[in-house]
Regions:
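Conserved AMP-binding
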Residues: 67-70, 91, 178, 188-192, ...
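Phosphopantetheine carrier-protein modules
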Residues: 26-27, 31-35, 55-62, 396-399, ...
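AMP-binding/adenylate-forming domain of the ANL superfamily
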Residues: 1-110, 114-123, 128-145, 160, ...
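Gly/Ser/Thr-rich phosphate-binding loop
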Residues: 204-207, 232-234, 246-316, 325, ...
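Regions immediately C-terminal to embedded phosphopantetheine-bearing carrier domains
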Residues: 1, 5, 81, 142, ...
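Conserved AMP-binding/adenylation subdomain of ANL enzymes
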Residues: 156-185, 193-233
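AMP-dependent adenylate-forming
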Residues: 1-4, 12-15, 111-135, 165, ...
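Conserved pre-ATP/AMP-binding loop-to-beta segment of ANL
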Residues: 131-147, 154, 178-184, 190
Length: 612
């Protein structure tokens, strides 16, 4: 599209392109050995839509979906759109109280799907497994409702307008590369906006969506095998997942021979040596860097092609898409001042046809973040950017991420890029830590080789930084991790790194490993009665705590991966694995019982284990 379509016309990019594929024999979905062609997929969506209509669902309603990774769930998303309703994907692994709160805030009228703990008062729509019907209808006012990540406070649901999302899908379908029919991996959890981008841009172009299991999603080697076996041509990945895949390829994982487009979003893109090496072996492939919060979805894009050696370490997030307006204002400004040719930096405001309706059921918060200025509506992104004369934007981090050390402003991304240039570094995150000496810089590192000595690596990195960075940019401390903690969105949890840096752990030197490991977990979970055979996730284990435990374990000469920690979620099973013995049957049963907890993890663990 050369310009934003605007208004109700943009909704035509949602359902009609899918319906246009009905007569084709092409495969719409693949999930393991199951293949579903376009016609069968649409008729299944039609049956679900008819069941929803029979339950009284119509335009403007909200439908809760159990967000499992199955063809029927994908069909249910399309069915909701056809009814004019908004799907509300809910992760069955979340606590029942949180699920109930989300459904209540969104005003969900019914729920579709099994295995989700919602109040009995919410009617369930059951669709016969063999039911099929012609799909008809069209999008209503909302395309979807998604609750943003966060473990405290009242849930915050973004209500995305159908015409706004339709603008993005229309841009995709008209794109010379992204608009082609492609075999696309459905990587993002359905509770995140990128999943809708994957779904509608793929099926609307006549492509094939390949569904991935959670175990494959968390394991980069298994994921590479799937990508190679299925001939996946397009990926949507957060930066941390792309890095993990690139590392796995370098370590001998299956090569993604058919890959031609990778779309990354969710956090600042680093063109690391591993990522460059991957694309150097994929001639003609393009790396697309997208930016956009859930409240607007994607609003800018930049393409990296050609020789990866020429790519900048921190690629820009690009220029505004046709349906978005972007302005840069002073970080403390109350008004939206047009960026124009200003080559400065500041707070990014987002406007245009891309904006969500707001936060469902929370008018005060909507008014706070979506503001009226100069006769237009703007979303206060909370992100800092730098703008070039041609409108190209560079992401500098969140307003809350800006650091000052001894009065000097510090950009963590610059330090992280320097660290990632070191041959032994797979990932790096730099955060500010407040202490007796004031605020200092702490570098958190995931090494390429998990067996590297921590002290030697920290010393080498300090020397490396001193040789390449200004003195005030050299981190004071270097922490070596098995993996970095991730939020549910797949982004690195920087706040968790800074918040938990001061928690001291006591390791019982000289004690048997089983006692040391159990004692460490009792400290982390504040659970003195924790038993060796107890499921750690039943006692509050979470992503950050797993990473901290494995990092401490590594300091004392033992290596356990994040994936193994989730596969064997008891101290006894993990110790058996570490000591090279057989894992007892009850440990394996615990591993099976831990599937629900691991689904909640829903992370892509880097090696050792949506739009921004």
């Amino acid at each position: 599209m050369s310009a934003a379509v605007r208004g109700a016309d943009a909704r035509s990019f949602l359902l009609p392109p899918l319906l246009a594929q009905a007569s084709r024999d092409a495969i719409a979905l693949r999930h393991g050995a199951v293949e579903i062609d376009q016609a069968a997929f649409l008729s299944r969506a039609g049956a679900i839509a008819e069941a929803l209509r029979s339950a009284g669902i119509g335009e403007g309603d909200v439908v809760a979906l159990a967000a499992s990774r199955t063809p029927d769930t994908i069909a249910a998303v399309v069915a909701c759109i056809a009814c004019g309703a908004a799907p509300l994907p809910l992760d069955p692994a979340l606590p029942s109280s949180r699920l109930a709160a989300m459904a209540a805030i969104a005003g969900a009228r019914v729920v579709v799907g099994d295995g989700i703990a919602l109040p009995p008062s919410l009617p369930r729509v059951v669709v016969d497994a063999d039911a099929h019907a012609a799909l008809h209808g069209g999008a209503g006012p909302l395309a979807y409702v998604l609750f943003t990540s966060g473990s405290t406070g009242e849930p915050k649901g973004v209500a995305m307008r159908s015409d706004a999302f339709g603008e993005l899908v229309g841009w995709h379908l008209a794109h010379p590369r992204l608009g082609r029919a492609a075999v696309t991996l459905q990587f993002a959890p359905l509770g995140f906006d990128v999943s809708f981008q994957e779904l509608f841009s793929t099926l609307g172009a006549g492509g094939t969506l390949v569904l991935v299991d959670e175990a494959q999603r968390r394991d980069p080697y298994a994921l590479l095998e799937l990508i190679a076996r299925e001939g996946v041509q397009r990926l949507f990945l957060p930066c941390v997942a792309l890095q993990a895949l690139a590392e796995a390829v370098a370590a001998g994982g299956a090569f993604p021979h058919a890959l031609r487009d990778v779309v990354t979003a969710g956090e600042a893109l680093h063109a690391t040596p591993a990522v460059r090496a991957l694309f150097a072996e994929l001639p003609g492939a393009v790396l697309h860097n997208h930016y956009g919060p859930t409240e607007s979805h994607v609003v800018s894009a930049h393409e990296l092609a050609g020789d990866p050696a020429t790519w900048p370490d921190l690629p820009p997030i690009g220029r505004a898409l046709p349906h978005a307006r972007l302005r840069v204002v002073a970080a403390d400004a109350d008004d939206a001042t047009s960026a124009g040719a200003d080559v400065g930096e500041g707070h990014l405001l987002i406007g245009g046809a891309c904006l969500a309706a707001g936060y469902i059921g929370r008018p005060a918060l909507t008014a706070e973040r979506f503001v009226e200025r100069d006769g237009a509506r703007w979303y206060r992104s909370g992100d800092r950017v730098r703008i070039e004369p041609d409108g190209t934007l560079h992401y500098l981090g969140g307003l809350d991420d800006q650091l000052k050390i001894d009065g000097i402003r510090v950009e963590p991304g610059e330090i992280e890029a320097a660290l990632c240039r070191h041959a032994d570094v797979a990932q790096a995150v730099v955060v500010g830590v407040d202490g007796p000496a004031g605020r200092t810089l702490a570098a958190h590192i995931v090494p390429r080789d998990p067996h590297l000595g921590e002290a030697a690596l920290a010393s080498a990195l300090r020397t490396h930084c001193a040789a390449t960075l200004a003195p005030w940019l050299v981190p004071r401390t270097f922490a070596i991790h098995a993996a970095l903690p991730l939020a549910a969105s797949g982004k690195i949890d920087r706040r968790a790194l800074a918040r938990d840096a001061d928690q001291a752990l006591h390791w019982r030197e000289g004690a048997p490993l089983a006692e040391q490991w159990l004692d460490l977990w009792r400290q982390l979970l504040d659970a003195p009665q924790l038993g060796a055979d107890d499921n750690l996730f039943d006692h509050g284990a979470r992503s950050l705590l797993v990473v901290r435990a494995l990092t401490e374990l590594r300091r004392h000469g033992h290596v356990l991966s994040v994936v193994q920690a989730y596969e064997y979620p008891s101290v006894a099973a993990q110790v058996a694995l570490l000591e090279g013995g057989a894992v007892r049957d009850e440990g394996r049963r615990e591993a099976e019982r831990g599937v629900a907890q691991r689904a909640a993890f829903a992370r892509f663990a880097p090696r050792a284990g949506g739009a921004r």
